[in-house]
Amino acid sequence: MEFVVVIPARYASSRLPGKPLADICGKPMIQHVYEKACLSGASKVVIATDHQKVFDAVSTFTSDVLMTREDHQSGTERLAEVVDLLKLDNNTIVVNVQGDEPLLAPENVSQVATLLNESTAPMATLSVAIEEQEDVFNPNAVKVVSDINKNALYFSRASIPFDRSAMMGEQSTLDLTPFQRHVGIYAYRAGFIKQYIELSVSPLEQLESLEQLRVLYHGYNIKIEQAHITPQAGVDTPEDLAKVISYLQSKHA
């Protein structure tokens, strides 16, 4: 099985300006992500950016970097541009890896690519078990429910599935076993990425602010299974960055 990894690296970030170039133990964050992705077995790993500073920095460690337009409304639109620039065959599997995950588990990248490869679905993703009750009620932790055939039924910021007896009684009795948190890594068939951006925006997607709901709304399947490796948190804030640096320093001490 061959697959291509695309890592979007936008320079602008409201909470951490210049995020892809943030220094982590002597390397820019985007280089950490790239090196982890290269361990996944991908036939090609490409970084897609919209800023010259990122392009120049990435060019010091790989030639697989593309300059994309600044006016994309979503990450998927940027991905579609990359598919066109690389002239990928419609059946090529493309894994979209977030550029702010320097502790990325390569095993999860290959897992989501394999999950898609072994199905007829146009798209696949991963989840992890929710272990803390507060995450069930945290709208920033996106929950997902799936069917017996590993098809996602729905993604929501709400508490799904709704445990009627526990949630209408004492929450201390809540069993966390059915709850899964969505992990933001996706595998697509290249041809579907181009289809996706032509699909109309769905009311559910707008309500929940979850782009993947557009796929379900239009009747397509998204394959999902639990990640073999529980992913480490990404970097959104200076505090997150400090935690990652501390973690890597302690690991190499």
UniProtKB/Swiss-Prot annotation:
This is 3-deoxy-manno-octulosonate cytidylyltransferase. Belongs to the KdsB family. GO terms for cellular component: cytosol. The gene is kdsB. It catalyses: 3-deoxy-alpha-D-manno-oct-2-ulosonate + CTP = CMP-3-deoxy-beta-D-manno-octulosonate + diphosphate. InterPro entries: Cytidylyl_trans, KdsB, Nucleotide-diphossugar_trans. Its main location: cytoplasm. It comes from Pseudoalteromonas translucida (strain TAC 125). One of its GO terms (molecular function) is 3-deoxy-manno-octulosonate cytidylyltransferase activity. The keyword Transferase applies. The keyword Nucleus does not apply. GO terms for biological process: CMP-keto-3-deoxy-D-manno-octulosonic acid biosynthetic process; lipopolysaccharide biosynthetic process. Activates KDO (a required 8-carbon sugar) for incorporation into bacterial lipopolysaccharide in Gram-negative bacteria.
